[in-house]
């Protein structure tokens, strides 16, 4: 089965929105957009394997698999923060679509580069702010 990056993003957004402290969601009872239950189950399993979510995976006697999701991990939050913005996500998808296979780690790195490019573009509109950002990045604390 192929991992659907849109399903990954939508599931992470759903987990962040719906799962509170001391709560969980069962992937079997989760419905998101146009994704099949198999897509959601496969995505949840892969996110758990990758360390992006805290989940309990149970192999049931009838041969089915149950996944209870308790939270995003620190890495899950970092990944979601990189791909949350719709404009960033759209640009990231257009870049990675040019390749036949791209890991979630690469998707996250591309999204981070897209964000940095957008920040750099914004900083270019304010030269003084750009100078301060550059100097502080070099470790210079005497900006003023």
Model-assigned labels for residue ranges:
Residues 33-50, 66-67:
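Short amphipathic alpha-helical interaction segments
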Residues 2-32:
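Short amphipathic alpha-helical interface segments
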Residues 48-59:
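A short, conserved structural fragment
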Residues 64-95:
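Short, amphipathic alpha-helical interaction segments positioned at domain boundaries
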Residues 90-128:
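Hydrophobic, helix-forming membrane-interacting segments
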């Amino acid at each position: 089965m192929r991992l659907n990056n849109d399903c990954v993003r939508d599931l992470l957004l759903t987990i962040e929105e719906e799962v509170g402290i001391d709560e969980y969601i069962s992937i079997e009872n989760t419905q998101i957009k146009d994704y099949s239950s198999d897509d959601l189950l496969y995505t949840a399993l892969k996110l758990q394997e990758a360390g992006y979510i805290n989940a309990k995976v149970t192999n049931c006697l009838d041969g089915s698999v149950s996944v209870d999701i308790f939270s995003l991990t620190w890495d899950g939050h970092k990944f979601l923060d990189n791909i949350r913005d719709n404009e960033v996500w759209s640009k990231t998808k257009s870049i990675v679509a040019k390749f036949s296979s791209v890991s979630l780690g690469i998707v996250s790195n591309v999204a981070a580069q897209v964000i940095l490019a957008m920040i750099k573009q914004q900083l270019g509109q304010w030269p003084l702010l750009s100078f301060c950002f550059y100097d502080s990045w070099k470790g210079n604390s005497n900006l003023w």
